Amino acid sequence: MDDHKPIETPDGPAVDTPGIGARRYETPPTELPITEAEAARAAGLAHNEHLKIASGYLRGGLADGLLKHATGAISEDDGQLVKFHGMYMQDDRDIRAERTKKKLEKAYSFMIRLRIAGGVVTPKQWLILDNIATTYAGSALRATTRQTFQYHGVIKSNLKRTMAAIDSALLDTIAACGDVNRNVMAATNPAQAGAHKIALQLAKDISDTLLPKTGAWREIWLDGERVVGGEDAAEVEPVYGKTYLPRKFKTVVAVPPSNEVDIFAHDLGFIAILDKKNRVTGWNVTVGGGMGMTHGEADTFPRTADVLGFVQPEDALKAAEAVMTVQRDWGNRKNRKNARLKYTIERFGLDAFRAEVEKRIGKKLGAPKPFTFDGNGDRYGWVEGDDGRHHLTLYVPSGRIKDIEGGPQFLSGLRRIAEVHEGDFRLTGNQNVIIANVPAGKRAEIDALVDEYGLTRGASALRRNSMACVALPTCGLALAESERYLPDLLSELEESLARHGLQDEPITIRSTGCPNGCARPFISEIGLVGRGPERYHLYLGAAFDGSRLSKLYREDVTASEITGTLDPLFAAYAKDRQPGEHFGDFVIRAGFVAKTSNGPDFHERTGPLRAA
């Protein structure tokens, strides 16, 4: 793993930051966030800041907007607030031009994302979620890159019915999106049942502790009575206040040696430190990771997280709240493009940030403990845990759980399995599904159903290590195809790899339709990031375990050029690699692409260093 710590100097927190040069960190702010809407406007804060303050704890005009049946949309401001409730307003971009030509409103619908800490659901919950998919969401359920489910295509008139059904499963969508702590991920390694149980519990505890306390969700979507009557001033958000966070905040819990949650790509992380019996003795805390950037703006960049320090188990929740509240108070509320925690740490320095976290916890953090990750992929097929239970990981392309004509019947098959399954289901950060906690005597029944419905226990090495975001046609930010394009590209690349004898070599490849990085392409050995229709930036050189960022190798590569661009590199890799050397490490050692030290260095020395 690369060393992400800043270089301290004798005269204070001036650092030689790769790609920026020697500079001195800014002095951290001492004032608390502005809590009055007019004052926020006068101070030049981003529009979302005074919108949040004036929203009545995330109510805004949502209740009234749902009653406007002449449109399938809600207002632009409510479109920002509804994110905190777990939704994005979208439209079908495949037919947008046609509808505009006919002078029709866009084909609006909503994406709904659930909050499922650790990605664990019971068979009963699965059946309810399946019924929602078939009733309101086009008979499809999507496992996300952050261990939860999304529904696409839910129209406005069905939103409250959908939310009521989700509530009946004892689940919700609160804080699945928006400027809050979002769904908390947890390690799913089935071979370490004891450590996983502790990681899952920490994820749930963090999710509950950092959950917004507003009653707006139940009031708006379930017609619940207002939790606090009278004026808004009577209702409080004890952790967030009226302003919530400057930007999204993502938290994960990892258990080495597997980094399937991609801990270095998140704002806050906890790495389990295990003894020789796989018992959790404490947690290394990581801070400041994040993927999103903006094309052409060098002051935006992905960043891998720093290891802040070590905490005892009893201090983990305090550390989580302390890290998040420092970001609440120090984060940039004027420029949302520079509002994530990664930029806060770049502005004020890791040492100043650590000191403030320690102040809020009330004690010093310990020195980080050693740990090792061996990859960020899933373990496919059957695995027996250290508790004697059995777990089957299924490969679900891009997480899309639906019945495919002439192919796997994911929706129907998993429904049948849920009807007989005695354990639970676990989503992975790689968009796959684990049929978990199966008694030994039930394996044959599960196997028979998997075979009957053509469910996939695995695929080629490349496909097993691939991910794609949704992109077109529903995502409003997509510049290029991703989920719909990746399968065809993988087929081409599989042929190329096979020609060079690399068909069994695990190489991570991820695709996103825009640079926001939902599928975490910048820590993938091969990363494709949409630039325009059928055009992508091609990134290479990330670490196989997700601990090092990639580097831009080729700009604006067309879809038809990608395989031809990579084939000579595959040939060189097959010929000149060292034993056990991963592709991302090879392209750096062989001099094809520069190594990225961390975020500010991401945009430096881009392009091929030599011809392949």
Swiss-Prot record:
Subunit structure: Alpha(8)-beta(8). The alpha component is a flavoprotein, the beta component is a hemoprotein.
Record-annotated membrane-spanning stretches: none
Pfam families reported for this sequence: NIR_SIR (PF01077), NIR_SIR_ferr (PF03460)
PROSITE patterns to which the protein is assigned, alphabetical: NIR_SIR
Region span, Disordered: 1-26
EC number: 1.8.1.2
GO cellular component entries: sulfite reductase complex (NADPH)
Main enzyme class: oxidoreductase
Functional pathway: Sulfur metabolism; hydrogen sulfide biosynthesis; hydrogen sulfide from sulfite (NADPH route): step 1/1
Cofactor binding remark: Binds 1 siroheme per subunit.
Catalytically driven reaction(s): hydrogen sulfide + 3 NADP(+) + 3 H2O = sulfite + 3 NADPH + 4 H(+)
Name of this chain's protein: Sulfite reductase [NADPH] hemoprotein beta-component
Cofactor(s) needed by this chain: siroheme; [4Fe-4S] cluster
